[in-house]
């Protein structure tokens, strides 16, 4: 049998396909930044967390009512797609922690978390293999601001609620006191950490693992005054940010702005020649691929902590 194989044809991208590829790559890069920022909460994620986060970001950007395809990012997005996103579906926060909570902003623009009463015995539903080990719990709220157009994020404030296995605490309101920058997207996560008491030294060991680590994004607020897209690569400097905030600011390897700039060049080139720039090579390096999270992050299971007295 003779097999005749022809030479593969060059794939010519249309302007629309280039926009779609750019938007997908931008979503992947954005999701990677969010996962990195929430690393303490994201450490014990399940195997599909990366793809799930990218999908939520992609849907958010596609749901934009203000930006045009290929010229928009998460600052234009419908952030409702991010609310409720679980970092570990093996132990969903919404199922493990049976506590009413609401997040809002008051007249001063501060973020307010209203947390219902918690009876640890009934409100915290642990898997059977953890029930006899856990003696204390910590509920952590992490507020992080993102400015993708200036390529940084900022740790704004953390709040903890601590409770023992047999304790009941009353309903409470937490007001985040940090002054909130108007150019940042604000994301708030909620994480439940379980601890085992160590009688010898009165410390507690963390029990969270990839099999049990309830954590989710519970609120997302759009930037009030989003910055303009940068016309050239960022200098990765903290220009314009008060020095007092520098210790909490993290500069990021975000690719979204570069992808949008390159898309404009490709479309202009195609309009002139009828052939997209670098069509033969495809320039695939400009579009990040989604890869499942790998590597060996520091395992904090068994990490000892001390609880303050209330």
What do these predicted regions represent?
Residues 156-169, 177, 198-310:
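Short beta-strand elements
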Residues 6, 84, 94-100, 237-238, ...:
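Short linear recognition/processing motifs and adjacent strand/loop elements at protein termini
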Residues 1-91, 256-310:
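Long, polar/Ser/Thr-enriched low-complexity segments
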Residues 62-232:
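Charged linear interaction tracts used for macromolecular binding and regulation
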Residues 1-11, 16-18, 25-26, 35, ...:
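Intrinsic structural disorder
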């Amino acid at each position: 049998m003779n097999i005749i194989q022809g030479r593969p044809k060059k794939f010519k991208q249309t302007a629309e396909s280039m926009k779609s590829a750019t938007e997908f790559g931008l979503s992947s890069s954005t999701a990677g930044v969010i996962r990195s920022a929430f690393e303490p909460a994201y450490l014990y994620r399940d195997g599909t967390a990366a793809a799930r986060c990218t999908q939520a970001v992609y849907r958010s950007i596609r749901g934009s009512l203000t930006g045009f395809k290929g010229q928009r990012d998460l600052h234009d997005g419908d952030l409702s797609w991010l609310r409720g996103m679980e970092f570990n579906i093996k132990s969903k926060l919404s199922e493990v922690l049976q506590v009413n909570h609401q997040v809002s902003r008051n007249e001063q623009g501060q973020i307010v978390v209203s947390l219902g009463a918690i009876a640890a015995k009934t409100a915290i539903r642990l898997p059977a293999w953890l029930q006899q080990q856990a003696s204390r719990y910590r509920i952590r709220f992490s507020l992080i601001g993102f400015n993708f157009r200036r390529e940084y994020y900022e740790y704004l404030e953390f709040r903890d609620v601590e409770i023992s296995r047999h304790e009941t605490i009353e309903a409470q309101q937490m007001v985040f006191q940090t002054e909130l920058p108007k150019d940042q997207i604000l994301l708030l996560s909620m994480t439940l950490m379980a601890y085992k008491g160590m009688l010898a030294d009165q410390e507690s060991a963390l029990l969270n693992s990839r099999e049990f680590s309830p954590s989710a994004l519970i609120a997302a607020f759009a930037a009030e005054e989003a910055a303009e897209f940068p016309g050239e690569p960022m200098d990765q400097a903290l220009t314009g940010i008060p020095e007092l905030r520098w210790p909490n600011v993290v500069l990021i390897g975000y690719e979204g702005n570069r992808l949008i700039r390159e898309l404009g060049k490709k479309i202009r080139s195609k309009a002139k020649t009828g052939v997209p720039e670098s069509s033969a090579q495809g320039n695939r390096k400009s579009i990040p691929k989604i890869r499942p999270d790998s590597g060996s992050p520091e395992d904090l299971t068994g990490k000892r902590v001390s609880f303050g007295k209330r």
